[in-house]
Amino acid sequence: MNINRSRLINNFIFISILVFFDQWSKYLVVKYIRIGTEYLSFFGDFFKIIHVRNTGVLFSIGSNIDPSLKNLFFLIIPIIILIFVFSFALKETNRIARIALVLILSGGIGNIIDRFFRPLGVVDFLDVKFFGIFGLQRWPTFNFADSYVVIGITLFIIYDLFAKNQSTNL
């Protein structure tokens, strides 16, 4: 098996596992926790599991825009971006960059699945205290797909700033 085919298979397996975990966690939240209900709290109120829906994007931005525009901004454009990221990931030779891109793809796919199949919005359920940093007492509620995207982007920025000029096979 050539390296590109092996890389494609590995990426597909990794993406499938992450998307499955994201969707499974959302399924459990939808099945067992009513919308707007806090289910568990850990370490006082530092970390909570609460079922909310997000009809916008990051931090609920755009949740009030016209529904006819939501398909364009929250489905079509993200799908085009994911196709670009996927093609970039297939060509990338650096392992760190590939992992970052696969994380971004996994998160994007997980949230796009919600947009297609959950008319009430993307399922968010992880709620973390933020101690007033940036004026936020609590970080906006998120899900595993959101985490994949943030970790992937952070990892890619670190790679781009520090490791890009190093060997391509870190």
From Swiss-Prot:
Main location: membrane
One Pfam family here: Peptidase_A8
Any one Gene Ontology cellular component term annotated for this protein: plasma membrane
Subcellular location as annotated: Cell inner membrane
Membrane topology qualifier: Multi-pass membrane protein
Catalytic residues identified in the record: D124, D146
GO MF, one annotated term: aspartic-type endopeptidase activity
EC numbers for this chain: 3.4.23.36
Pathways per UniProt: Protein modification; lipoprotein biosynthesis (signal peptide cleavage)
Transmembrane feature ranges: 13-33, 72-92, 96-113, 142-162
Origin superkingdom: Bacteria
GO biological process, one term: proteolysis
Annotated keywords: Aspartyl protease, Cell inner membrane, Cell membrane, Hydrolase, Membrane, Protease, Transmembrane, Transmembrane helix
Keyword Hydrolase listed: yes
Function: This protein specifically catalyzes the removal of signal peptides from prolipoproteins.
Record-given protein name: Lipoprotein signal peptidase
